[in-house]
């Protein structure tokens, strides 16, 4: 059976792995998941990520980051989902925790943070909140 929301699965795997203090987590890979992992790395929420070939299928491995024994990612929340897509214009992109967190947005110019989307002047689909 196919997965109905692979991005929500990715976020859940990251949350669950951090609860049990795993150093890394592996999942099936896709272009959107790689783009999200790239944003998380650029913002300092994860150590690193790598795409490997396992049993003929691409696999995304994410190295998780901790500070003083606690996960760096405190909140990882899916916003737009298959049953209810959430699109925001450039002026309506939300601030997460008054700018302390990040909203990951899928725009016509690629997947980026809310700050970069506002600076670029584009809106798009709000994928998730990270704090």
UniProtKB/Swiss-Prot annotation:
Record keywords: RNA-binding included?
yes
Q: Name one GO cellular component term.
A: ribosome
Q: Which PROSITE patterns match?
A: RIBOSOMAL_S8
* An example Gene Ontology biological process: translation
- Molecular function as annotated in GO: rRNA binding; structural constituent of ribosome
Q: Which Gene3D superfamilies match?
A: 3.30.1370.30, 3.30.1490.10
**Keyword set, alphabetical order:** Ribonucleoprotein, Ribosomal protein, RNA-binding, rRNA-binding
Q: Which family does it belong to?
A: Belongs to the universal ribosomal protein uS8 family.
Instruction: Report quaternary structure and partners.
Output: Part of the 30S ribosomal subunit. Contacts proteins S5 and S12.
Function noted in UniProt: One of the primary rRNA binding proteins, it binds directly to 16S rRNA central domain where it helps coordinate assembly of the platform of the 30S subunit.
Q: What is this protein called?
A: Small ribosomal subunit protein uS8
Query: What lineage does the source organism belong to?
Result: Bacteria, Pseudomonadati, Pseudomonadota, Betaproteobacteria, Burkholderiales
Q: Gene symbol? A: rpsH
């Amino acid at each position: 059976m196919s997965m109905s929301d692979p991005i929500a699965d990715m976020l859940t795997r990251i949350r669950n792995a951090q609860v049990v203090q795993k150093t890394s987590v592996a999942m099936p890979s896709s272009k959107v998941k790689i783009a999200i992992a790239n944003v998380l790395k650029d913002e300092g929420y994860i150590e690193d990520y790598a795409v490997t070939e396992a049993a003929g299928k691409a696999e995304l491995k994410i190295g998780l980051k901790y500070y003083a024994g606690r996960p760096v990612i405190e909140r990882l929340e899916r916003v737009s989902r298959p049953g209810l897509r959430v699109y925001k214009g450039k002026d309506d992109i939300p601030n997460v925790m008054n700018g302390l967190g990040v909203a990951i947005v899928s725009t016509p110019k690629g997947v980026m943070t809310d700050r970069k989307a506002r600076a670029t002047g584009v809106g798009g689909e709000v994928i998730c909140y990270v704090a």
